[in-house]
Amino acid sequence: MEATADGPAETQSPVEKDSPVKTQSPAQDTSITSRNNADRGRVLALPEHKKKRHGNLPAKSVKILRDWMYKHRFRAYPSEEEKQMLSEKTNLSLLQVSNWFINARRRILPDMLQQCGNDPVIGHKMGKNAHATHLQSTDASVPASSGPSGPDNVQSLPLWPLPKGQMSGEKLPDPESAPSQKLTGKAQPEKKVKFSITSPFSPEPVSPEEYADFSSFQLLVDAAVQRAAELELEKKQDPNP
């Protein structure tokens, strides 16, 4: 009988102890789940908060930076001193100013140059064409000054004064047949001609005294004419040769 009485008591005690635990477990699970959801919401909201903090710069600061870039649009690379000055004006850090210029040179500067009519692509092409034209003109002027003399280059050469005999179409005498003229040519002193680099390339005026003396040649011509006249007169006087 004692064993049977103790048996039910022992079987009821675990039920009484376990029943309160089972009734409290759903509330604990709900609180844990709500805490986890709240933590997840904070984690998801954290990047948005950071994005708002590190978003666009103030409009006033951007206007100051844009004005500086437009003023220096042909050399939009501020020095360290200029970055420090812009940082003080815009209340931004040096890193923010540097990053803004890096992005602005790729996104804002090309449109700014096109609006001003200074397209960097067109300007680069025009510079190449002008350089090529200058090289062609330089190459074309070199043969005219230092190239060999040909039929095409004769017209560009300056006209030098010709001796009196060549201008009249007479043939110059042979140096061996006129020894007196040969001696006269040796006796003449050498003349130095000065050229000026700054003034146009033109010869100095030469006096008639500096030309070669053709008096001996004129004497030979007169003697030949006189001899021909004598022969003609002899033929007329002697009808029967």
Curated annotation (Swiss-Prot):
Keywords associated with the record: DNA-binding, Homeobox, Nucleus, Transcription, Transcription regulation
Keyword DNA-binding among UniProt keywords: yes
GO molecular function: DNA binding
Example GO biological process: regulation of DNA-templated transcription
Location in the cell: Nucleus
Compositionally biased region (Low complexity): 140-151
GO cellular component, one term: nucleus
Signal peptide: none
Region Disordered, residue ranges: 1-58, 130-209
Top-level taxon in the UniProt lineage: Eukaryota
Entries under Pfam families matching the protein: Homeobox_KN
Start-end of Polar residues biased regions: 21-36
SMART domains (alphabetical): HOX
DNA-binding region: 48-111
Family: Belongs to the TALE/TGIF homeobox family.
Function: May have a transcription role in testis.
Identification of the protein by name: Homeobox protein TGIF2LX
UniProt source species: Pongo pygmaeus (Bornean orangutan)
Encoding gene, per UniProt annotation: TGIF2LX
